[in-house]
């Protein structure tokens, strides 16, 4: 009984943060942090144990013969602070909620940089889902460059996304062929799009002939 009382007494004196078992509680907080990332003039605290467990690149970086292994302050290049925070949030929480297609692409690039393939796939799925849900009118007027997304996806080895985007451009040929960035497609990409375009030239030709036929039937004078 005395042991139980002492245990309860100890629990009432413990700080509340010790009861929180979610890693989200430690995300972007200096509490128990043992590494600080310096990015775009700002600092972001983190915990090596979490990073090593969740990211192979960081595991090699902090355990190998690299400067980062013995440094508390680690600089980060080639990525914005917002994107890097989203990347760290995924490592801590195993969840990802991009605010836009462009943010998802930036996060995908960061995931490719640190070789976190699952996060890459999540970003790919987000981009595909968002583009699929866009009405044709919005696709025609948006300033978002789908061809630009295709180029980035190819450059960063996102084969699934780049293949889907190429089919998406071909399927919506009449919309994307009118955009200036359509000319940025490579010869190989243009050949693929022309071969798989919809509507196809054959379909458009048949449609024009049918409309011509219908118009001629309406205009014919029929004497009863």
Listing of model-derived features with the role each one plays in the protein:
Residues 1-4:
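Ankyrin repeat (ANK) tandem arrays and their immediately adjacent linkers/low-complexity segments
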Residues 16, 100-101, 143:
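A conditional alpha-helix N-cap/helix-loop micro-motif detector
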Residues 31-135, 139:
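Canonical BTB/POZ domain core
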Residues 18-22, 57, 86, 202:
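Exposed alpha-helical structural elements
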Residues 24, 30-35, 74, 129-224:
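BTB/POZ-protein C-terminal extensions
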Residues 12-30:
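Charged, flexible boundary elements
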